[in-house]
Amino acid sequence: WPASVLLHAAETAPFKIKKDNRLKVGIVWSGSVTFGGNAKRAVGLDRFLQLAAAVPEARFFSFQKGPGEDELRRHGSYPLIHVGNLFDDFSATAAAIRQMDLLVMTDTSLVHLCGIFGVPVVDLLNYLPYWLYGTEASTTPLYNSVSFLRQRRPGDWDDVFERVAQILISLAGKKQERPNMGARDILTQIRNSLGVRLELTETPSPPSRHKAALK
């Protein structure tokens, strides 16, 4: 567990993205509003609109679902590309996230799906996050592809987004130089930015042509 869980990605993604040398970033800014701690772990759409403006060399795809989509309808999504309304199950979602170079999100269940399928993700954590992630580490032994950016002070998202912007600016530049960067290359760059050595562990993979492994 968790890589041994038998999850399968759909054979065909619910949308296709033209390949180019721009970094593809999936985003989510809020989890389930029925979760008691969601107000502390979630942010507003405006945070990610500012992030997209700070990294114009990247393309940002909204995987947001639920009430968070109302913000898109009220304020408009530009320059984000909203794809969260194109899939409704984990299989289709898994196929969709595999088209991204990485995802940047506040803590939601999608982090676990990214981890299972080896998709690089930067999980933005509030000061006292889900107990499973501890209080200090930038990585977790549960998933090779998950990295954490944590609040250094309670409620301070400004610092978190400044740091993730610097990571994405660096990644976008690397992607311009090397359009064929794979998940492992992306993850290595993220870990370098965090000052963490990349150490991949051997874990069993789902018996599917869409394996939960970094390639």
Can you describe what each PLM-predicted range is?
Residues 181-215:
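Boundary detector for helix-to-coil junctions that initiate low-complexity/charged tails
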Residues 1-190, 210:
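Catalytic machinery of carbohydrate-active enzymes
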